[in-house]
Amino acid sequence: KSNQSTRIRLNSTVVHVRHQGSGAGRSVEVNYVHNGLTHKVRGKACVMACWNTVIPYLVPELPAQQKEALAYGTKGPVVYTSVGIKNWKAFENLGINRIYTPSMHHYRVLLDEAVSLGDLHHAESPNEPIILSLARYPAAPGLPKKEQLIEGRRELLNTSFEFYERSIRDQLGRVLGGGGFDPGRDIFGIAVNRWPHGYSYTYNTLDEPWDWVFTSSDERPCVVGRQPYGQITIANADAAASPHTDAAILEAHRAVEEVMSFI
């Protein structure tokens, strides 16, 4: 609205960010594409809140060391699958609410959380329909972590929905069949949510220094990469090397405080 100071540009992809001018008149210019046309805006400062690995391409004037630090990690691929079933009698008959299956395509199967919201009510009886939550973290055992994540992403992108459907029906039939579950009869819907670039990269003691994992060392790539550059600051979960919401919120708070210190 015209009386608001905030402007949100939907469906607009940023392609280039750089400083303009010098001294007190210095600003940040942001170029973006909307409906096939390039536009630009200027401001006193800019917060880069996208993936770390993308930032060096958008802000090519960054120092080489900072670019290297931002490019260090890689996103972890994730598959979260929801399966609608007509009832959960099989779970009741087996006396379980979740199953861990490390040798199958989805490593975990569990009953959805009993949450009601407004007019939407969770299943209260085993005779009622419910959603099953399945999870898979594609990887390639035996390789260093980053290589595993890259190979897992390749697998995810090359796996067809038909394969997911067949493997889900087979898996649920095998683990729940003893409780009377029939995949052909009891499944009424499958939604496969694929995140090829899912969770932020986290450090581990097999491939990286212990202090990166167990301390807040300033030597960590996430710390080197998130340093302010001129009037450009960086905020995202990658900047904390953590996939959690609280980390993203804390990094956003830090980046905005940095902006407030020089505008």
Task: Name these PLM-found stretches.
Residues 1-5:
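Short mixed-charge
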